Amino acid sequence: MCIRDSAMSACATSGFGTKNTSIAYFDSAAIDTILMFTMAVAGIHFGLIYATVTGKYNNIFRSEVTRFYLGMMLVCSLVVGLSLYFADIYPGLLTALRYASFQVVSVVTTTGFATADSNVWTPLAIIVLIFGSLVCASAGSTSGGIKSNRMLLAFKMMRTRLRQQQHPNAVLRIKMDGVIQENEVLHLVSLFIVTYLAFLLAGTVFSTLFGVDLMTSFSASMASMGNVGPGFGQVGSMSNYAGLPAVVKFSNTFLMLLGRLEIFGLIQLFFIKWWR
C-alpha cells in the first residue's frame, strides 16, 4: 500500500481511498490490522489523546466514554465474527473475526472502509453493524453519528429510571467520569437522540416514495446522517450511491450536512429570528 492510498482517510475517518473495492483490494491482514488501530484511535476524543500524550491525563482508559466506545467495538466484533463463523460464511474463526472486526471498527468510527461485502452477511451481523452505525465513536473525534457520549448517558438515564421505579424515595444522580450531569444536559441529550431518529425516519420514508427499497432507504439515510458512507442493499460496502434517484441523492446530501453539523447547527439557518 502506498502512503497516499488510505493513511489520511483513516486518521480523518473519512473513508476515501484510491481503489473501487476499498481496502479489500489489498487483501492483507497486516494492512487491515494497522488501519483498524488507526481508525480506533481516531475515534477517541482528540483532547483526551493530547492530554494523555502530554502527561496531563495519566490514563486514557480512565474515561468512561473511551471504555464504553472500545468495549462496544470489541463486543460487536465478537458477535459479528461468531455469527459469520457459525453461518459458514468464512472458513475459520480467525478469518471471520478479521473481517468482522474491521467492518465494525470502520462503521463505528464512520470511516467507511470495507474489506468484504456485508450484504451477504447474516441478519444478526447486519443488525449489529446498524447499531454501530448509530452509536459511533466519541465526541471530540472526527466521527459522526449520535456519539458514544450521548448513548452512554442515555443508557445511564434508562438504568437510573429503572432504579427510581424500584426505590421511589431515593435521590439518584447520573454521573459521567465522576461528574454529576445536570438535568439540562440530560434533556439536551434526549432531545438530540429523538431528533436524530426522527430525521432518520423522515429520510427513510422520503426515499421509499421514489421507489427505493426499504433496506436501502433506511441504511442510506442512516449512513448519510452518521457520515458513515456504506450502508446495505444498493448502497452496500462494495457498492455506491450512483444508482439512487437524483432527488434521493439531494435528500441524503441534506442528511449528511444535518448530521455533520449536529442537527441544530443547520436547523438554525432556517429560523431568521435566531440570528439576532
Label the model's feature ranges.
Residues 4-276:
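Membrane-proximal intracellular helices of multi-pass ion channels
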